[in-house]
Amino acid sequence: MITGIKQMKNSILKIKNADGGIGTGFYCLIEPNNWNSFPLRVVMTNNHVLDENNIKIGKKIIYSLNNNKINKQIIIDESRITYTSKKYDITIIEIKE
């Protein structure tokens, strides 16, 4: 059980968008199923943290893991899977690194 709690804690991210806005999100691993044959790693957050303007091609997103000990960046390009919905207040971005 402690392992599960540690894994959950390590999945929480701090996200900074190109406009300087800051929010939180989660690192998620989507397991293979009928429609994809490989695990898909994504950042999932709210649309009010990263909206359609923040996930346009060329935009940069910085996220921090492990209480800001590890910083990574995503530069949005055509090869990434992205999804956002204002109605459902969700944004998903594929991680390739």
Feature locations, PLM:
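Serine endopeptidase catalytic core focused on the charge-relay Asp
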Residues: 9, 16-22, 37-40, 44, ...
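Short beta-strand scaffold segments in enzyme catalytic cores
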Residues: 23-27
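Generic, ordered loop/turn and secondary-structure boundary motif
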Residues: 28, 50-51
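Short beta-strand micro-motifs enriched in acidic
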Residues: 28-30, 84
